[in-house]
């Protein structure tokens, strides 16, 4: 199935409540899930605008075999996207017959609403906020390459490498074909906002991982040395797992758990492309994993990134309207699960270091979960100071919460995120 047909299928599924955008994208069997997800999200964001243009241009009356959802995707690509990919084939020819009329109707809509930019046609809640202006962060996959080789490749393509950034202001100022190394994150390259690398040969070969800046924190802060045994408790879609494997240099073992079979299948493809060979995937509930199982007796490190409200993820608003402000009932349920998962992780007998992370902004899912878990294990574990140079710290809701990290588009040029590093307290002998 081609990109445009796959995107139309996802839009139809969302409209008929068959699932969320992300879930339907992962179950679509389309190979490039990032590309498909981006196209669906942008088409959905402009849905009302596209409906108006298609109706006023009479496109569906003229092309009676053209399905509405496919028409919406194609018109988005023609008028608002990057143009037809791979030449566009018959769809480019079909839309070409109506191109002048569609462009005229879009221009007429702007005049009618008194705006000059496409973005200004959106409802306020759908307009790009700070997150849409974030730089493009690209993690170098050290299982397959190194930063120097990647930098040289981009330089040969006409990009200008500016070295390591000295501050976030350097990242904010990026334009054109300039790129930098992140000031705090090793192996993380930074390109201007809206840089599209989904079709780049290094990405397609698994040499690059497109990953949010804050999403790189959990594996980096867990920092398991090569040869370690690690549990990735809620692993899909797999970017953090591949990061762990890179830190391990594929030496050791990662036990990765997730309950969603389709997400695990996509994750297996992602890990194979990234060259990961030290990971054992299991379709299993982490809460049902026995800490006394001999397989896990050498697990010293656990990464726990459980299901959460996603209130720090701007894209979640497209899938779940209101996700930015989850209801008290939903928060209570999520926090209960998160606390059970964290307390369960702390029962693994050889555990030395754990990273707990969420893409939530809510205190109930973050500081409160960590505080309660530590209180249930008095004297056994403590919060470790994490990345002192990181500017955004945990909320001061209990002593030591400043050791936690928070992230946001405004303060750290990333999605909303929370990270806590928990270490076992060594008992004096």
UniProtKB/Swiss-Prot annotation:
GO cellular component: nucleolus; nucleoplasm
Active-site residues, as the UniProt record annotates them: 359
Record-listed Phosphoserine modification sites: 167
CDD domains, A to Z: AdoMet_MTases
Superkingdom: Eukaryota
Annotated Pfam families: Methyltr_RsmB-F, NSUN5_fdxn-like, NSUN5_N
Enzyme Commission (EC) number: 2.1.1.-
Tissue expression remark: Ubiquitous. Detected in placenta, heart and skeletal muscle.
Places the protein is found: Nucleus, Nucleolus
Induction note: Down-regulated in some glioma; epigenetic inactivation is a hallmark of glioma patients with long-term survival.
Function: S-adenosyl-L-methionine-dependent methyltransferase that specifically methylates the C(5) position of cytosine 3782 (m5C3782) in 28S rRNA. m5C3782 promotes protein translation without affecting ribosome biogenesis and fidelity. Required for corpus callosum and cerebral cortex development.
The protein, known as: 28S rRNA (cytosine-C(5))-methyltransferase
Native source species: Homo sapiens (Human)
Name of encoding gene: NSUN5
